[in-house]
A protein has these predicted regions:
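Non-heme Fe(II) oxygenase metal-center motifs and adjacent flexible, charged/small-residue loops
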Residues: 1-167
């Protein structure tokens, strides 16, 4: 796992405002409702047990701001996923599905009030059996074929993920 950047407070505010404007749908994974809401651009991968289906969604280029973030952090990405987790949300240890290429770029956004020092709570992210505390606005790149998880959240969170569908 590698930190690419930590967004400035102004950039975080702009991205949070953008997230609030997105229409999110409840995620269904292997036929079950999950703790997350989602929205896809480019290509969506839907999973049902050992099968995956890839669907076209609105083009990434249909949103100039989103397209600029893709070009900045993972220009080859053809699939972007926005997740919202509520307090208590979690995702167990897993490897991402084979329909994706290995590398993922993720922007972590914490939807909670800052403390007196202007800092928001961190998000625990477990990757490769090590715990990391992701800051609000932290941009990371990681290999999704290494076990990773998000333990039970203490604050709501957005996760904006850039990926490439494997050819």
């Amino acid at each position: 796992m590698k930190t690419l950047e930590i967004l400035s407070p102004v950039e975080c505010d702009r991205l949070m405002s953008w997230c609030y404007q997105q229409e999110l749908n409840h995620e269904i994974f292997t036929g079950q409702l999950t703790c997350r809401k989602q929205r896809w651009w480019g290509f969506e991968a839907e999973f049902y047990f050992n099968r995956s289906h890839v669907y076209e969604r609105p083009p990434i280029e249909s949103d100039a701001y989103l397209s600029s973030l893709r070009d900045r952090y993972q220009p080859e990405a053809n699939s972007i996923l926005l997740y919202r987790y509520e307090v208590g949300g979690t995702i167990g240890e897993h490897l991402d599905k084979q329909c994706f290429e290995e590398m993922v770029t993720l922007i972590n956004l914490v939807d909670d009030l800052p403390n007196l020092f202007g800092q928001r709570p961190t998000t625990r992210f477990r990757w490769g059996r090590q715990n990391y505390e992701l800051e609000h606005g932290q941009v990371i790149a990681f290999n999704s074929r290494v076990l990773h998880s998000v333990p039970k959240l203490k604050s709501p969170r957005y996760s904006l993920q850039f990926r490439r569908i494997a050819q």
